[in-house]
Amino acid sequence: MPTSTGAQRLAELLAPVVAGQGLDLEGVTLLDHRTSAHLRIVVDKDGGVQLDEIAAASQAISHFLDNDAEADAIIGPRSYTLEVSSPGIDRPLVEPRHWRRAIGRLVRVQLPDLGPVVARVQDVTGDQVRLGIEWQYTDDGACVRQYEERTVAIAEVRPGQIEVEFEEHP
C-alpha cells in the first residue's frame, strides 16, 4: 500500500539529489510490504531524459538513501527496491514545465468552454499555453474537425494527455 506521508518527505529529501543530476523530480511513490519496501522515483528534464542519466540518478539516489538517517527511518529496517524511470507518454500534463516539454505534440485536453478537444501545443509562456485546436468532441461523442488557435491558462484546463501520432505511409 502507498504511504503518502513518507513519500512526500522522501520527495523533499530527494529533490536536491535529483536536481544535482540536472533532472526534475516528477514523482515519488513508496509501497510498503511486510518484509520490504518498493520506492518508485520518476525524473525528467527539458528535451527528455536519457537512459544513462536515469542510471546516474539511480546511483545518486541509492547512495543518498543508504547514507541518510531520515530516509532510512522512513523506509525502515527492511530491504527496499529502487525503481527510477522517466514519466512515460501517459503522464498527465499539469505543470507549466510538462506543457513546455510537449510543445509540438498533439494532446487531448478538456477546455472550460469547448469541452474535450485534441490540439497541438504551440507555445507556453508563464502559466499560459497556446493550443492549435484540431478536433472537438461533441456531446454525442462525435469528433468534428475544426481549427482554432486559443491561449488558455494552464490552471483552467483539466490535465492534458499526449496523443500518440503515427506516421502515414504512402
Curated annotation (Swiss-Prot):
This protein's GO CC annotations: cytosol
Function noted in UniProt: Required for maturation of 30S ribosomal subunits.
Family: Belongs to the RimP family.
Pfam families linked to this entry: RimP_N (PF02576)
GO BP, sorted A to Z: ribosomal small subunit assembly; translation
Signal peptide: none
Record key words, sorted: Cytoplasm, Ribosome biogenesis
Subcellular location, record wording: Cytoplasm
UniProt protein name: Ribosome maturation factor RimP
Organism per entry: Acidothermus cellulolyticus (strain ATCC 43068 / DSM 8971 / 11B)
